């Protein structure tokens, strides 16, 4: 058995161990669509030519940001939509934090390959490059 085969076998047999995980239920596609509709409504309410920002309560930015711009309501897009343990995939919303993703996937013996240092970084933020450390 090769080292890689050995590792694959050990990973397949591994059982998740609780640390501070709080298992959460995925929100589902209907709730996701409600969040998308809420976001679209807030976008359509922004006057033409105005700059926009994400209106959210928390941030992992380590610089100030202007509150003068119109805010897009992303409050309905912060969850895990669905976990498929057979395909080993998860559908998530853009404002989903890595903390919530791990809490939703660990009960299935899954987790992301990479988790940023700040567990409240959103997947959307990490994908756009904000979660990458230099």
Label the predicted regions:
Residues 1-134:
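Noncatalytic alpha-helical scaffold of FAD-dependent oxidoreductases
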């Amino acid at each position: 058995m090769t080292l890689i085969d050995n590792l694959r076998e050990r990973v397949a047999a591994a059982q998740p161990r609780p640390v501070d995980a709080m298992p959460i239920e995925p929100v589902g596609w209907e709730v996701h669509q409600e969040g998308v509709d809420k976001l679209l409504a807030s976008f359509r309410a922004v006057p033409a030519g105005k700059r926009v920002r994400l209106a959210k309560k928390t941030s992992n930015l380590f610089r100030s940001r202007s509150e003068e711009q119109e805010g897009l309501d992303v409050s309905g897009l912060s969850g895990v939509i669905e976990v498929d343990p057979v395909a080993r995939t998860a559908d998530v919303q853009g404002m989903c934090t890595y903390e919530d993703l791990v809490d939703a996937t660990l009960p299935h013996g899954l987790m992301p390959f990479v988790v940023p240092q700040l567990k409240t970084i959103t997947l959307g933020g990490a994908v756009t490059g904000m979660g990458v450390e230099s």
